[in-house]
């Protein structure tokens, strides 16, 4: 059983509880002290469980249809759309819930968040205050020299109803709530309305939160394989100061995944060093251990703004918004270099990139 409740720790210290509820594993990161069930915890846990039970009951009162919708009813509330990827001819499939179902899902997320369960420290996607850049900073702080990037195959689609339920039963407070008949039914109803055709879809508001939640036990185990491990959704990055044993690490990962639907996408597995190409979540660490965009991204960005400044009128509002977001993101990574490039091409075309990106546009659709 895993416990990651911030509210039951001293804010100046982090605790790990090695024995709680029949000596099952209870996890809290960056441990400095240990307690047993006989000491500090039992008075607080029941109060928190009662609070969680009340929150679930309030959710069913707010949305009585939660327990009435069948799997078929839920599936009918989705619309499937395909978004073109960067690779020509490839698409990302999104399953978008109706406004009615989406409202229920938003309230479900609020209810689950009120339980106070934290995501693992290694998870950086869909977590407020964490980003891809923050994930790479962890590897940078370790002065890592070797990197192993692993991609999970069909991550959201691998999260089936049974897998979600099985994972929740390992995490506090769900491990106890699922033992109580009324609460167990509500949790199963929540899983039901979170899924489309029996799996977590990309495109609804509950999937990102649930994936991080159910990955807590797995992230905990993966975190022990190499000195540094981070996960950004389906992208896992392992690093060390010495060369990583590729076969051994992959075998260990597959052993952790055994009995789960999770699979490694072997086509995207990459091992690299700081002296060569490293592909760390789209960013890189150079020889000086600085986070950089990498040569290829810089080359494409220069070509893009050069073309845009040459004839900005031919760009659609969607393309302008996309370029604006990309520029802001790149500025956060390498502000000095990106500012230099922008000024260079501003002078070349006698225009102002940032003004053009942020000026109000009107289009006829």
Can you name each region flagged by the protein language model?
Residues 228-232:
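Short beta-strand
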Residues 152, 233-234:
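Short acidic donor-binding/metal-coordinating loop in glycosyltransferase active sites
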Residues 1-85, 93-150, 155-204, 209, ...:
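Right-hand nucleic-acid polymerase module
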Residues 234-241:
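Short beta-strand->loop micro-motif that forms the acidic, two-metal-ion catalytic signature
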